[in-house]
Regions:
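Conserved N-terminal catalytic core of the sugar/cofactor nucleotidyltransferase
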Residues: 1-78, 82, 419
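Residue-level signal for inorganic ion chemistry
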Residues: 8-10, 48, 64, 103, ...
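Structural beta-sheet core signal
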Residues: 9-10, 59-60, 87-90, 176
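Conserved core of the sugar-phosphate nucleotidyltransferase
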Residues: 17, 21, 28, 68-154, ...
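Residues that recognize and position ribonucleotide moieties
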Residues: 66, 128, 135, 157, ...
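Conserved alpha/beta core of the MobA/IspD/sugar-nucleotide pyrophosphorylase nucleotidyltransferase superfamily
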Residues: 128-231
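Acidic, glycine-rich loop-and-beta core segments that form the ion-binding/anion-interacting portion
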Residues: 222-297, 301
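Glycine-rich hexapeptide-repeat left-handed beta-helix
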Residues: 270-432
């Protein structure tokens, strides 16, 4: 974290194992605390404070406010320290404060109390300044105060918000600090609010990339993870989703309607209407439309994977092309090679996967089946429609198909009365 806390504790309840595993992934040093009975925010803080040092300040955040910026929290912490507060709460003014606790201020403008909506009168519900669930407390004071909490409220829970009025009544200095951007403080309680927050985060991320020199044609339909790295002068077309450890080099064009997950894209590459994951796309390579690039694939510079091509765990050499309607699995393809339309790399025997090796400057004829394990030497050809089951030496052509036989008059004898038979008769065909 940019805030560099001395210790990080996360209180978990529902779906404990899933949450704990995720916390370990993103913050291995964080300590998780289990709240078996959900007795309110005050109870959660009681559990988190156990065995925590009594010195310094503690920052408390809600787990459902993911839009908070570290800069906002830094300013909040600095204001708390500068004013030597015992307790501070971050607030926001919302267009619709429904569902949030209200901030009650005195005539002097200072905070008097925080009242949860279920406990608020109609007069208090008219207040649009709300509690964001972000606090800073002096640890020693907080430890004492949370032990005094009671359940005298509509939900029968221990409210952390009651600590503010308690500290105030005991002469401690408390403050409500207003956030300038209320969207940072939005909470998530349902799928609608989740979608709203996701859209805000999307816009933030896209704005950052655009200001750094990335062209995003339609930011509202372009979704980019925070983990993605994009160099300047990249163009992203509508309907694109970039996730994971994806890195895109300068001059590349991505989309429209393209998904990249953990993909390294080198300079000047072009990927259109395709799905690519855990792969590497070389400089000036072309992918799509409608290509499916699966994990373990490496496309060298100036290579091409075209329309309706699926590639899995394969390396395609510099300048090589798989232009149309093919499946390439577990293959090594050299440079300057062309794979004809409808070629299938038959890599699976029902039990194990096998590798196919294709050399440099090879020409694979359309509708060829390469039954692995098999290899095709440099400069070799395969005849269209062949089923290749044996290695082809360099410079040879592999022909593996039955000889064509024309049976004259078959349509007239076997399909009499059909349109085909009528056309054949007009063309001079006979039954003999």
């Amino acid at each position: 974290s940019q805030l560099a806390p001395k210790e990080l504790r996360v209180v978990v309840g529902a779906h404990r194992e899933l949450v704990e595993n995720h916390v370990k992934e993103i913050s291995p040093k964080a300590v998780t605390v289990f709240q078996a009975e959900r007795n309110g925010t005050g109870h959660a803080v009681q559990l988190a404070l156990a065995e925590l040092s009594a010195n310094g300040n503690v920052l408390i955040l809600a787990g459902d406010t993911p839009l908070l910026r570290s800069e906002t929290l830094s300013e909040f912490i600095n204001a708390h320290r500068t004013n030597k507060n015992v307790a501070s709460v971050l607030t926001a003014e919302l267009p619709d404060p429904s569902g949030y606790g209200r901030i009650v201020r005195g005539e002097d403008g200072e905070i008097v109390a925080i009242v949860e909506e279920r406990d608020a009168s109609d007069e208090l519900k008219a207040i649009d300044e709300i509690n964001t669930g972000v606090y800073i407390f002096d640890i020693a004071t907080l430890k004492t105060s949370v032990q005094k909490l009671n359940k005298n409220n509509s939900q029968g829970e221990l409210y952390l918000t009651d600590v503010i009025s308690q500290i105030k009544s005991e002469g401690g200095k408390s403050a409500a600090i207003l956030s300038l951007d209320y969207t940072e403080t939005l909470g998530i309680n349902d799928r609608s609010q989740l979608a709203e927050s996701a859209a805000i985060m999307r816009d933030r991320i896209n704005d950052c990339h655009m200001r750094a020199g990335v062209t995003i044609v339609d930011p509202t339909t372009t979704w980019i993870d925070t983990t993605v790295e994009i160099q300047n002068d990249v163009t992203i077309y509508p309907g694109t989703w970039l996730t994971g450890a994806t890195k895109i080099a300068t001059g590349s064009v991505i989309g429209p309607r393209t998904t990249l997950k953990n993909v390294i894209v080198k300079a000047q590459a072009n990927i259109v209407e395709s799905n690519v994951s855990d792969s590497e796309i070389g400089c000036c390579a072309n992918v799509g439309p409608f290509a499916f690039i699966r994990p373990g694939t490496k496309l060298a510079d100036n290579s091409k994977v075209g329309a309706y091509v699926e590639v899995k765990n394969s390396e395609i050499g510099e300048g090589s092309k798989v232009p149309h309607l093919s499946y390439v699995g577990d293959a090594q393809i050299g440079s300057g090679t062309n794979i004809g339309a409808a070629t299938i790399f038959v890599n699976y025997d029902g039990v194990e996967k096998h590798e196919t090796k294709i050399g440099n400057d090879v020409r694979i004829g359309s509708d060829t089946m390469l039954v692995a394990p098999v290899s095709v030497g440099d400069g070799a050809y395969t005849a269209a429609g062949s089923v290749i089951t044996e290695d082809i030496p360099a410079g040879a052509i592999g022909v593996a198909r039955s000889k064509q036989r024309n049976i004259l008059g078959w349509v007239l004898r076997k399909r009499p009365g059909t349109k085909s038979a009528e056309s054949a008769k007009k063309a001079g065909a006979s039954e003999n």
